[in-house]
């Protein structure tokens, strides 16, 4: 999408998108940026860039907006790839959001320097004298520069300024009814706009807020400075704006702190999701081990500073690339449910077999010379789910990276309470071994014996090959041909994404559609 021209009204509400999709410098390698851009549907790249930019918002709003879709060719790994990409975007949002917070703090300090305080205090004293008030304006002047105001204190000072304006003959409630405030939160979803007395003030302050998010170097514009005015309404409007920016900074600090904690805890949950994918492709053991180590480093850090999320993100992306190359379906919920069903059947857990009581449990492979028997409902027996490693000694049996997999199950429900029980799934290693045995044309017992006596890694043949020739296919190849490549929408230079109406449930969100980028 081309950048709006100077005359285009969308320019004031548009956010610049660079070739990196606004990922921060030094966060990702060019290879990983290209990987994410190629994986995400073209129609979602604008939203990715907007969220990457660090647009100030609450963490729950960020999570709600993270509806990133990967392209159809990556459907097999969608349930693992999309959470990894969303996590990466959240980290980018945190990094850029921290920079925006520093920019806002610096701009606020510049706009409320000693000279500005003195000018505002002098103006307030004139107002107080005109209204015969004995109050000291010092508290209000200091509150404008206070970046630790609570919501209650902020609202109290806003009401006080409203009362001063009303006493001067300026009814804020009446004057603000005809004003358009829709641009005030286009670039900042945390900003709580007070009521102002003129459209000029609203327009000027909205440009200031846009400059914060865009990290422009221009200082704040205020009515009293631009007009060189000592008029009470303009002084009070400026104080309202700076007071509200101070409160916004407090909210932004709290939001980034909550997001940082959420990202640390989410690293643990992501490890569980990726572990199921690892069991499907055991040859990714070394990569998953790095993912787990980096996640643990985040969780165990005691530093008050923001931890370094970059190594964890890089390890996850490298891991997911290997999962994609394995060409298997990674469906964590389905796999865990199937493991629970098989485990319940193996151990005779009454009430936990979930409909498998009358199902056929065992199948015999007639093509196997040992009349091998395998469980019908073992997901690792399906070559669309499990990629058998070439070297069994390094990846199967005791060499499998261990993690206790668990699954919750609703076991009782009354009018007052729902009770869940957490089941451990200790049979994962055994089920993986059975999947390997089937692919290697062995019985599970033979595989177990092989692993106990062989220590030298040897590639195991898993295809039906005789005399050096592969057996003819029994069935037709009905795989769908790859889709024709589509022209990428990103190009040289920069683009822009219009942010008006991007906020959830926005009243100005009209005519927005999500276009599929490929069939």
Curated annotation (Swiss-Prot):
Taxonomy, superkingdom: Viruses
Cellular localization per UniProt: Host nucleus
Compositional bias of kind Basic residues: 510-519
UniProt keyword list: Host nucleus
Disordered: region residues: 485-519
Pfam families on file: Herpes_pp85 (PF04637)
GO CC terms of this entry: host cell nucleus
Family matches, as InterPro entries: Herpes_pp85
Function noted in UniProt: Plays a role in the inhibition of host type I interferon production within the host nucleus. Targets specifically the NF-kappa-B-mediated interferon-beta transcription.
Protein name according to UniProt: Protein M35
Organism encoding this protein: Murid herpesvirus 1 (strain K181) (MuHV-1)
Gene giving rise to this polypeptide: M35
